[in-house]
Amino acid sequence: MENTYHCYANRELSWLRFNERVLEEAEDSRLPLCERLSFLSIFQSNLDEFFMVRVGSLYDQTLLKNNKLDIVTHMTPSEQIAAITPRVAELQAKCDKYYQHLLSALKENKYIKVDFDHLDKQQEHYWKAYFTSEILPILSPQVVDQRHPFPFLRNKEIYLGVLLHEKHTSEHTLGIVPISSQMERMHFVRKDNETCFALTEELVLLSLIHISEPTRRVVIS
């Protein structure tokens, strides 16, 4: 009997095609803007779940001596991972492009995302003060070194990685900064007839560069 494995779609790749259709809803200009943003969020949440459950399971299977083949397509776990990786990169690039389109659409409607690379003096002062009073007290940064092993990172949480320069030894160490789910993810500022909004992780990144401890300072974040 002729081999018909090529006639069938792999379950993981088929799921990615489904999630691509969710993503394409974010680019449909016929939909309300907030609904398009919601589809973008759903796409990303779906992808998180996909990696936690499906891709994680495939990686576990690669550790077994006798890898089970996919019943339908007869692909090994390693072959499935190799097929998934470029497909996800393609979808993520498309998601990033749609995100920029939606930011432009938001700007047309007087909702402007704060660009921390181009702040005037007044804006810089405001956000630094906000970080110092509202965010810094609840940050719990961790250093990874010989005395402190790499910490457990929880699923669906945001972490920032920073490179720290040790002043006494000139060596570099890794720092992990958890962005607690207890923090507000976004911060809004009303100005005239516009509303500016900032992401917490971007504000933390900006502020960490200007923080220097007695023994170390942030050089890359």
What is each stretch, according to the model?
Residues 6-47:
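N-terminal-proximal low-complexity accessory segments that begin disordered
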Residues 11-15, 35, 43, 73-76, ...:
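Secondary-structure capping and boundary motifs in well-ordered enzyme cores
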Residues 27-30, 40-116, 193:
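Extended, charge-enriched "interface" segments that sit outside catalytic cores
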Residues 90-93, 185-191, 198, 205-206:
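Membrane-embedded alpha-helical signal segments
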Residues 123-174:
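Extended, Lys/Arg-enriched charged tracts that mediate electrostatic binding to polyanionic substrates
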Residues 135, 194-195:
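Residues that scaffold, gate, or flank divalent-cation-dependent active/transport sites
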Residues 146-151, 155-157, 187, 193, ...:
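Divalent-cation
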Residues 209-221:
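Single conserved hydrophobic/aromatic residue that forms the stacking wall/gate
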